[in-house]
Amino acid sequence: MDSHTSTEGVPLSETNNRSHATPSAQYCQMTVEETCSKLQTNPETGLTSSQEAMHRRDIHGSNEFAQEEEDSLIKKFFEQFSENPLLLLLIGAAAVSFFMGNHDDAISITLAILIVTTVGFVQEYRSEKSLEALNKLVPPEAHLIRAGNSQTVLASTLVPGDLVEFSVGDRIPADCRIVKAVHLSIDESNLTGETTPVTKDTNPVTGTPPIGLADRTNTAYMGTLVRDGNGTGIVVGTGSHTAFGAVYDMVSEISTPKTPLQASMDNLGKDLSLVSFGVIGVICLIGMFQGRDWLEMFTIGVSLAVAAIPEGLPIIVTVTLALGVLRMSRQKAIVRKLPSVETLGSVNVICSDKTGTLTRNHMSCTTCWTVDMGDLANAVTLKPGQSHTEADPKAVAALKNSVSLANMLKVGNLCNNSKFNREAGHLVGNATDIALIEVLDYFGLEDTRETRKRVAEVPFSSSRKWMLTSTTTGDSSTPMISVKGAGEVIAPFCEYYCKKDGKTAPFNDDMRKKVTEIASEMSNDGLRIIAFAYKQGKYEEGSEEAPEGLVFAGLMGLYDPPRPDVPRAIRRLTTGGVRVVMITGDSAATALSIGRRIGMPLMPGTQSVVEGSKLATMSDQALDECLQTASIFARTSPEDKMKIVKGFQRRGDVVAMTGDGVNDAPALKLADIGIAMGQGGTDVAKEAADMILTDDDFATILSAIEEGKGIFNNIRNFITFQLSTSMAALSIVAVATIMGLENPLNPMQILWINILMDGPPAQSLGVEPVDPDVMNKPPRPRNEKVMTPDLVKKCVEAAVIILVGTMLVYVTQMQDGVIDKRDTTMTFTCFVFYDMFNALACRSATKSVFEIGFFSNKMFLYACGASIIGQLAVVYVPFLQSVFQTEALSVKDLLSLVLISSSVWILDEAKKYFLKSRSTNNYTNSVV
């Protein structure tokens, strides 16, 4: 990327010029003390009260950008006319009718125009509101310290003077003057265009003002990402008074591309429009050659165009997708991008993290082992969730008699970044860190971190696989270096081990071998292994290397139980042709143990488990062969995850990938569906993802895939309904015109049919409940078109039935040779009833209404009920009779029409029964 251009396409020079007036330009040249003094805050405890924060918010406003004013409802309503030229033609037809003295026709057409535009306006308004609701589902959050208490708040509530914390993967919530930085580096590429993370410190910036954005090394900008380390900062600018706010107006107009499905609907609409215009043109020409009134033919032609051209398809698709996404959100799955809904139904491989997704992400220490204990059978064992008052007496005795065990617990305590949240009433932080604090209660020990000062830290990373802290009691005593990490990484750093009496002895190769054996045994039981080491002495600040001469303290086995719904979810996914692959940083033995517990399909006699070290050396061909059988990938790195996803995609698979850390972001973005964790996920993972699980539960993915498949089926169902109705309406007028008959439907009736076709019945098909058997069918091919030959065939079949039945009624009603209002009313009502029964048949492409249940879709019942009531009103209400040129029908007439129009549903039910019976017979014959 060009270093002189930001990722949004804003020239860096212009970004700098606009940002010179922001508060960070002044505060970056002040010391921490000067900044805190000016903002009347504390660098360790933040603002003193919420009342003070509220007062500052009244002065500075919320920490958010001003939104553009929405167009008024009146403006949106009248935009319907400019967006649909056919409506303008209808207005012209109404005007011509009025000036020629046909006032009834003019009034009728005008009312129809108002009804059509109102329906379109309501649909579009509903779509926009649904999408607005989606955008509000993932509010940005900030980690705030106020009055010394840590809490998570909405970033929009921050004010200047607030103290915020940030660590790897977090997005900076406001412009901050950094007051603490531990190996802190921040990715500012989305602001400055520089892709290399910037190392941050707390020192004031020197130089002649104005100081450029890239030179403010003590400032963390809103919207930038923490790539390494952690820190705290005082908020100095919020909302429009941030560097991002200065250029917000230049990047706020971002057009949202249409989803592939919406694009295909647009193309389908254009194709159908061309066909419809062709048919309508032929109808009008034939009518004029037959000597019919040109105004009548023009009005009918335009009305047919309005009814036959499915201009409402893209809107209904959007509404259906949006409502489906909102339903997913109630099931704890937040879809950030609408195209993801379409892709969900095609997913056939899920690459899932183990921790927190397949398991509960609540670690408990179950095993403590030190070198002097010898075999694993002598290790201290604990029951998850057990407090120290109920601990095994042997465990308490072991602590009293073993300094090495006490030292191991101490290292786990000091090398720890979890914190107690007073408001929530529990510890927050990394699951492993929380377990290492909770285990202290088992032995009646206290958290001693408040009595010691941390003077150095090397944060854990997936590449290092270890973490280090250096702490001191604050006096002249020698600092203590505490290290924890993977056993195979920590053991080589150690030169000594701690004996039972607290003395140290050389840590030789035999002991290293013993540690490896014990770790392997613990891994086979499904435990995560953490090794601990320590050393008395100073650690050089800024160093990234592990110190020499460490003392090995011991091993702990942590257990993270599987989530209860995961085995069922895996079975359901496997049945539906979706393969589940576990990707974890744990050892192969631990991963295999968990995989068996959750019921992963592990193929006997094949290489089901592959370690990251082997993966790194595999060629593409070897990887392709490996992916055919491997179900578990252990000890993986972020690069390994990328390689796995690319490998599956190379095979033609549609891949969903779960992740929560900043190192998962590349794989999340590469996958066809990136799924981030809502509770434990970092901001960068959430931003890279297409979907967020608010409960971090793997079973939620099953619900999302089911919903995705169901939504696509529903879209096909209402397309079937709309197209078959359009084809029938065109065919009826075309056949009548060719046969030299008067048109059976007048313009008002045609427009009424259009309202029913694009209105409630069609939309209610979009919210049909998901078929329980949807996971018994394989995933939909990625490039499968919406319009399949079977769908077109069904549309034609339904249209032919409606055409034949409606024309039969029309012809039989005019046996006297005169066409009156009763004849057209019977024909019109017959077509509308056909419409309702056709909608009933379209509720499922394969199942009978008796299987899915008459009352399972209440929205459908309400929609059809309202449509039928509307039709009866058109037939029986005097005012509407004059508008639609109808007359009252007898009960006998209505019953006969119901009997005739139900044929489209009855024949569809018979076809479904026949196909199902044939499928059953074919299976029976194949197994007999």
Swiss-Prot record:
Per the record, what is one GO cellular component? endoplasmic reticulum membrane
Q: Where in the cell does this protein reside?
A: Golgi apparatus membrane
What keywords are annotated for this sequence in UniProt?
ATP-binding, Calcium, Calcium transport, Golgi apparatus, Ion transport, Magnesium, Membrane, Nucleotide-binding, Phosphoprotein, Translocase, Transmembrane, Transmembrane helix, Transport
Please give the start and end residues of each transmembrane region. 81-101, 105-125, 271-291, 306-326, 718-738, 750-770, 799-819, 860-880, 887-907
Catalytic residues as annotated in Swiss-Prot or TrEMBL: D353 (4-aspartylphosphate intermediate)
**Span list, region Disordered:** 1-25
Q: Which SUPFAM superfamilies match?
A: Calcium ATPase, transduction domain A, Calcium ATPase, transmembrane domain M, HAD-like, Metal cation-transporting ATPase, ATP-binding domain N
Biological process (GO), any one: manganese ion transport
Topology in the lipid bilayer is annotated as:
Multi-pass membrane protein
Instruction: Give the catalytic activity.
Output: Ca(2+)(in) + ATP + H2O = Ca(2+)(out) + ADP + phosphate + H(+)
Task: Tell me the PROSITE patterns matching this sequence.
Answer: ATPASE_E1_E2 (PS00154)
Which cysteine residues pair off into disulfide bonds?
Answer: none
Provide an example Pfam family for this protein. Hydrolase
List, in alphabetical order, the Gene Ontology terms for molecular function in this entry. ATP binding; ATP hydrolysis activity; calcium ion binding; P-type calcium transporter activity; P-type manganese transporter activity
Q: Coiled coil: which residue ranges?
A: none
**Chief location category:** Golgi
Identify which top EC class this enzyme belongs to.
translocase
EC number(s) recorded for this UniProt protein = 7.2.2.10
Could you say which protein family the record assigns here? Belongs to the cation transport ATPase (P-type) (TC 3.A.3) family.
**Reported function:** This magnesium-dependent enzyme catalyzes the hydrolysis of ATP coupled with the transport of calcium. Has a role in the secretory pathway.
What is the name of this protein?
Calcium-transporting ATPase 1
> What organism is the protein native to?
Yarrowia lipolytica (strain CLIB 122 / E 150) (Yeast)
